[in-house]
């Protein structure tokens, strides 16, 4: 109930590793998050400290992460922050992991094309038939006349 939910913006630092487990699909990748600040003396942006997170995705999100992300991609990750400490070979190690709820490309830094998984990709439902894009343009001279437009009704009569 009292979980730490974070939204992190950074770059994919390692190739996503995808695995099919008994409990379902799983994927992980490292995310590099570098703070930036304005240097007033030099009038330019500077890179600050870089934090690295291991991002974990499960089930359908894992499948889509494995198929969509590459090293260097700018992404936005939302998920549960998990700080883990363990002893390895006599040394204490601390890692900051994110159990992802959502992962997407950062569209402030580039473009992306969304594609729904098809039924053959393992999704339960079949995607609806493609519909043509509606034409939002209005032909010149095709504006309806004022008398054919509905007139507003009074809000109330006193």
Swiss-Prot record:
Region (Disordered): which ranges?
109-158
Q: Name one GO molecular function term.
A: single-stranded DNA binding
User: Which UniProt key words apply to this protein?
Assistant: DNA-binding
Name of the protein in its database record: Single-stranded DNA-binding protein 2
What's a GO biological-process term for it? DNA replication
Q: Would the keyword Transmembrane be found if you checked this record's keyword annotation? A: no
* Entry-linked Gene3D superfamilies: Nucleic acid-binding proteins
Q: Which residues form a coiled coil?
A: none
Give the domain of life: Bacteria
> Entry's SUPFAM superfamilies?
Nucleic acid-binding proteins
The yes or no answer to whether the keyword 4Fe-4S is present is no
Q: Where is the SSB domain?
A: 1-107
PROSITE patterns under this entry? SSB
Subunit and partners? Homotetramer.
